[in-house]
Amino acid sequence: MEVAAATATSFTTLRARTSAIIPSSTRNLRSKPRFSSSSSLRASLSNGFLSPYTGGSISSDLCGAKLRAESLNPLNFSSSKPKRGVVTMVIPFSKGSAHEQPPPDLASYLFKNRIVYLGMSLVPSVTELILAEFLYLQYEDEEKPIYLYINSTGTTKNGEKLGYDTEAFAIYDVMGYVKPPIFTLCVGNAWGEAALLLTAGAKGNRSALPSSTIMIKQPIARFQGQATDVEIARKEIKHIKTEMVKLYSKHIGKSPEQIEADMKRPKYFSPTEAVEYGIIDKVVYNERGSQDRGVVSDLKKAQLI
């Protein structure tokens, strides 16, 4: 009984203090059971619940209107100002006499035309994307060829090892697994493991642009740790080198001994030299032909020189 009496006394004292703190205007607001209109109802609710997530036009520091502009406030009940939200629009553009939608991003446009572009070093994320594209294009059509454009330095860049040689082997195996023929084209550099992918394309459809560069080399690896671990890694990198020599020999048509001798140091090829060596089948020029290319021929046609 004494505990209950003490609790009741404390509650009465706390209630009296709270009533003294609350302004009379707030107490009068609570005493009004009805509101004149729906707008006054919304204003009263906004005044009664001062949450940082509540929108409105009141001037309290806790109001959501202080946190963002009223035009961006989704909970703004004011009828005098228009609401503003996020709207996604597709604006057509004119092409001739027809209205068309804007083109997609370039990567999607290339993929739509069955072009897979390798424009980075061979790292796991790049390998994963290329494998997914090959498999999907096979699912889409098993007859149409897939075009692989290569501009890559392999698994290294500026002498720094970025990926594993097995990344190239994974792409190589999928190239042989999918049913559509894969036409390869070097559009810049095809160095190291990227040169292996270039020469692994369909026979007769391995090509390069006139200013591209092709290079073959043996795999690179750096080891550290215990002597036993280094020895295991050394055997593995030798196995990778042997496998790479076999694959080059298979697609180029030269003996493994000659391939291994040429790979002791990095060996660079121009497109014409790559054709003679057997890495590619042809050099792709523009429509005007190799004998009619450049500024000089254009000036001659214009009778300026």
Curated annotation (Swiss-Prot):
InterPro entries for this protein = ClpP (IPR001907), ClpP/crotonase-like_dom_sf (IPR029045), ClpP/TepA (IPR023562)
Q: Which GO terms describe its molecular function?
A: ATP-dependent peptidase activity; serine-type endopeptidase activity
UniProt KW Chloroplast keyword: yes
Which keywords annotate this record? Chloroplast, Plastid, Transit peptide
Q: Which terms does the UniProt entry file under GO BP?
A: proteolysis; regulation of gene expression; response to reactive oxygen species
* Localisation: Plastid, Chloroplast
* One family name in Pfam for this protein: CLP_protease
Plastid among keywords: yes
Organism superkingdom: Eukaryota
Effect of loss of the gene: Embryo lethal. Delayed embryogenesis and albino embryos, with seedling development blocked in the cotyledon stage. Under heterotrophic growth conditions, seedlings develop into small albino to virescent seedlings.
Q: Which GO terms describe its cellular component?
A: chloroplast; chloroplast envelope; chloroplast stroma; cytosol; plastid; plastid stroma
Q: Where is the transit peptide?
A: 1-68
Binding partners and assembly:
Component of the chloroplastic Clp protease core complex which consist of at least 16 proteins: CLPP4 (3 copies), CLPP5 (3 copies), CLPR4 (2 copies), ClpP1 (1 copy), CLPP6 (1 copy), CLPR2 (1 copy), CLPT1 (1 copy), CLPT2 (1 copy) and 3 copies of CLPP3 and/or CLPR1 and/or CLPR3. The core complex is organized in two heptameric rings, one containing CLPP3,4,5,6 in a 1:2:3:1 ratio and the other CLPP1 and CLPR1,2,3,4 in a 3:1:1:1:1 ratio.
Main function: Involved in plastid protein homeostasis.
Against PANTHER family, the record matches this protein to:
ATP-DEPENDENT CLP PROTEASE PROTEOLYTIC SUBUNIT (PTHR10381), ATP-DEPENDENT CLP PROTEASE PROTEOLYTIC SUBUNIT-RELATED PROTEIN 4, CHLOROPLASTIC (PTHR10381:SF47)
Family that this chain belongs to: Belongs to the peptidase S14 family.
What protein does this entry describe? Answer: ATP-dependent Clp protease proteolytic subunit-related protein 4, chloroplastic
Species lineage, top-down? Answer: Eukaryota, Viridiplantae, Streptophyta, Embryophyta, Tracheophyta
